[in-house]
A protein has these predicted regions:
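Conserved amphipathic alpha-helix within the SDR
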Residues: 1-10
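Conserved mid-core segment of classical short-chain dehydrogenase/reductases
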Residues: 21-38, 79
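Active-site helix of classical SDR
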Residues: 52, 86
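Active-site-adjacent segment of SDR/Rossmann-fold oxidoreductases
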Residues: 58, 75, 96-106
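Residue(s) in the substrate-gating loop at a strand-loop-helix junction
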Residues: 70
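C-terminal helical subdomain
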Residues: 110, 130-167
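Short, flexible catalytic-loop segment of classical short-chain dehydrogenase/reductase
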Residues: 113-123, 127-129
């Protein structure tokens, strides 16, 4: 914070991409390591919010904030409960903040990819759900789409037809049905 106040930078883009997830039931993860779920909240929500608030005074018209959410934000995810909840926070925070900053000409985009072929799964565990395995995206394609959507002023960036169908499906279908479909 002191460095920012001293240097008074003209920030054009803030990318909040830190985050992690852990697959398994809440109880299984709790027995593995007590703090892992609260650490997930700290990294995925608190750190993103803190970084945004620290940088906000140095953004101006034309600046962009890109927050990495997830398609997990669209609907509850059994066996990925805390992660999905943190990403719902990121999506909601991004949309709300984007509306607040719109009149200042600052765009906030929540990036909501499905599974992406990255080191994320080395820690979280490999996807067990066949749909997640089939919809795995390449990181460079997700980033390209996110930057394109950010430049276009979109509040939400969703990569690929399967995830776009998921996004719209979660708006049309009851969440109870969608939660059961994830068990396939």
């Amino acid at each position: 914070r002191d460095s920012l106040e001293k240097e008074q930078p003209d920030l054009r883009m803030l990318v909040n991409s830190a985050g992690f997830g852990k697959s398994g039931s809440v109880e299984e993860i709790l027995s593995e390591k007590f703090r892992i779920q609260t650490d997930m909240v700290d990294v995925n929500c608190r750190s993103l919010t803190r970084m945004t608030l620290l940088c906000l005074p140095f953004l101006r018209a034309g600046s962009r904030i890109v927050n990495l959410a997830s398609a997990s934000a669209f609907c509850p995810q059994p066996y990925f409960s805390v992660y999905a909840a943190t990403k719902s926070y990121v999506l909601s925070f991004s949309r709300s903040l984007g509306e607040e900053l719109r009149k200042k000409g600052i765009v906030v985009t929540a990036v909501c990819p499905g599974p992406v072929d990255t080191e994320f799964f080395n820690f979280s565990g490999k996807p067990q759900n066949i749909l997640k395995k089939l919809t795995m995206a390449k990181a460079d394609r997700v980033v390209h789409q996110a930057l394109k959507d950010c430049r276009s002023g979109k509040s939400v960036s969703v990569y690929g037809i399967p995830m776009k169908l998921t996004y719209f499906g979660t708006k049309l279908l009851p969440h109870g049905f969608l939660v059961r479909m994830q068990q396939i």
